[in-house]
């Protein structure tokens, strides 16, 4: 009985140590009147928290990124009047 308790405790410790913050793929676009400083601030927040900018768009203001949920909430709140954030996924027509 003590042995199984020891194993369960070790498993709990290991699972907590290897917990990974899951990143979402998102597309973030901005209104044309968005100051470049707002976009740069959002990119910096994503990169500083371990996210990755996967593509920067040239025809419109925006970029795609892999970002964790906490950072995504922060970027969304700080840029709510400028940014549109949506999940990056495959879209098809019927």
Curated annotation (Swiss-Prot):
Family matches, as InterPro entries: PBI_I9, S8pro/Inhibitor_I9_sf
Coiled-coil segments: none
Cleaved signal peptide residues: 1-19
Domain of life, source organism: Eukaryota
Example GO biological process: vacuole fusion, non-autophagic
A GO molecular-function annotation: endopeptidase inhibitor activity
This protein's record includes keyword Transcription: no
Keywords: Signal
Family: Belongs to the protease inhibitor I9 family.
UniProt name for this protein: Uncharacterized protein B24G3.190
Organism: Neurospora crassa (strain ATCC 24698 / 74-OR23-1A / CBS 708.71 / DSM 1257 / FGSC 987)
